[in-house]
Amino acid sequence: MVRYSKEEIDQVYSLPTEVTDEDKKGRVDLTDENIVTIDGAHTKDMDDAVGITKKPNGNYLLKVSISHVSRYIKYNSPLFMRACHNTTSVYLIDSVNHMLHPQISNGICSLNPNVERLTKTYQIEINPKGEIVDFTFFDSVIKSKKKMTYEDCNEIFENNVVPDGYEPFVNDLLLMQELAQIIENRRKENGALDFGNSEIEFILDDDGTILDVTHRHQGPAEKLIENFMVVTNEALAEYMYNLGIEFVYRNHEIPYDDKVKEVVKLITSMGYRVDAIENSDDPHVMQAVINSLNSKEEFFILSSLLLRSMQKAYFSTENKGHYGLALNAYSQTTSPIRRLMDLIIEYILDNIDKIYDGTIDMEKLKTSLNGLCERASMMERCADKAEYEANKLYMIDYVLKRQDTEFDGYIQEITPRYMVVKTKELIEGIVYFDDILDGNYAYNPDCKWLENPSTRHRLMIGSKLKLHFKEANREYRLLKFNAEVNTLEREMTLTRTKN
């Protein structure tokens, strides 16, 4: 439970709960336009809304309206300092630790339906090839016409079923899907990497009891919003870079060549056919490796190997490009409710004229931004770890209630003492070598595999196992399994390693 200071609480209750006429002065009125939000069914903090039209010249006009949080959270105010402390919202299984007070996140800054909200609108004209031909942004006021859900939109996109209340929006949604696919195709042509969806989802009942565990579904609606947010962040980053003033970029640098080659060599030694890496600087090369593996059932294991060869993304005032997205410049501005640097970018855009004409000192601004970038990057990793550790506790609870269940699993990593394994449901655990029920296996440190000297059968990363619960330790968030080698896997591995 987050404890707020008196100053923070006072600021929360001093904020308006609705948009006033005074607030709307100087803003573009988009309240009559078909603008909607598309989020998860339980989302309360909605900070992005989308609208679309098609121009007579055949180009698409995409409007992405983002909650104007900086209008309410003044720079250096108590709530701003709180945001700098938290830096991000942390989404646990059954709760949210908000970056901002929930009365703000879910109230005046949330783009709730049928009420006016203050926004920054990013207007992007995109041609049928997916190229950005025009970009502008402006302060606006919107009135979202509907709170849509991914699930409902996917019914339209995947099953041609229109849920109640969606009838007036079908044409717009289909046009959005058309544009999203065009953007997706351009991203692939540029070399953008798709490591697949390896995010776990826990299905809970009303009491918080785990009913099931599965891969988080990423259907057409989820991809639509992802593509729209990516193209918005791309357009803004390119615009600001060309403008030449201080800004915050989301960098993902080129991977170290030796790391990439080491991982590809390991994957090749496991029997998979992968072309040798000549130039890892080009994302098309890594894209080709991914495409040669993504049809495999165990791809979620192989992709985690490839991900380890990548550098970590981070925030910086220096533009280094985004390797994974295959973009020359990238930013993150589409979630100012839940990410500090998105909020910081709003402050920059609010004061762009003062920065440009020198009223705001560029060197002082850069120093301040560098410190915020460093903290946000660090805290992002902490938040990811917190979510991961919370997930492991839920994994333990799920398995403890299914102790007699046999899980299909794969080897994710092999150490000198044990194997790290992951089930199809993305539940992680370990198997000590003594807990392999199919004979004695010896570790080969050079090849990083296990081999049974009697049968010559090898266990390597990606090998399939039958997993049975052995024990759990909640304090250390550890699941231990016994393992049984899948008969078919044994035959396949022998075939692979004979060549």
Where are these regions (language model features)?
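Extended, highly charged clamp/arch subdomains and adjacent linkers
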Residues: M1
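Electropositive polyanion-binding surfaces
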Residues: Y4-P445, I461-N499
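Short alpha-helix capping/helix-loop boundary micro-motifs
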Residues: Y398, W449-T455
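Surface-exposed acidic, glycine-flexible loop patches that form ligand/cofactor-binding
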Residues: R458
